[in-house]
Amino acid sequence: DLTTDNTPGSTGEMLLEAERLGAALVNMDSVQCLPGCPPGRTLRIVLHSDVSRFILVNSEGKRFIREDERRDVLRDAVLALPERHAYSIVDDEGFRSYNILMRRNAVIGVETGDAWRGDTPEDLARAMGLSPDALRRTIDDYNEGVRRRRDAFGKASAELLHEIRKPPFWACYAGMTIHYTMGGLSTNAEAEVLSKSGGPVPGLYAAGEATGGVHGVNRMGANGINDAVVFGRIAGRGAARA
């Protein structure tokens, strides 16, 4: 029941067809999620791309995890909440550090009910339907940790964190959106697709997110690009020679 930020064409029929030809699949139970719109919402707003500038809060207006936690841990923590979503909070400095498309979506989200804006933390909380006192206390405590360079939840590189203090304040839903699948076709170092018996499937090559096993069960951020570029080049050369 999770949403996805992938393209409509990413439906996986290729994996089923390759399996029909005898290809082996690995890690098909492993998916990676990022904050995004929860089920029932369609506008994905990104206020979380800089962990030094945002916090996650639950429906009580409280932080519940370090925002730079490993992606699988973050996913499980958010989905364990009663509402199965959290909220991303930034101030105007954080908001303006994002690109124009991210800001545009947030502005649209204020109109559609997918994002909120307030001149104070209390105003923001009221717009969100959260406790004004709780959200104010959460932001104050976070800012105190930034000043002391010691985050209460152990957020790394505390000396690089930014206080959340410049109005207006912004928030959006942070549900879990499927972003990447670690599962896929089993391949070797030559980007050849392997059969269930372990040998190459003649003439079949694969690279990038179509493959599985390259990243284990928890991909590090941005490594998918390296995977696709390196093995895409190898696969292309192999296919040209086949």
Show which residues each predicted segment covers.
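A glycine-rich dinucleotide-binding beta-alpha-beta segment and adjacent secondary-structure elements
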Residues: A134-N218
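Short, ordered coil/turn segments that flank beta-strands lining enzyme active or ligand-binding pockets
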Residues: S59-E60, A189, K196, V230
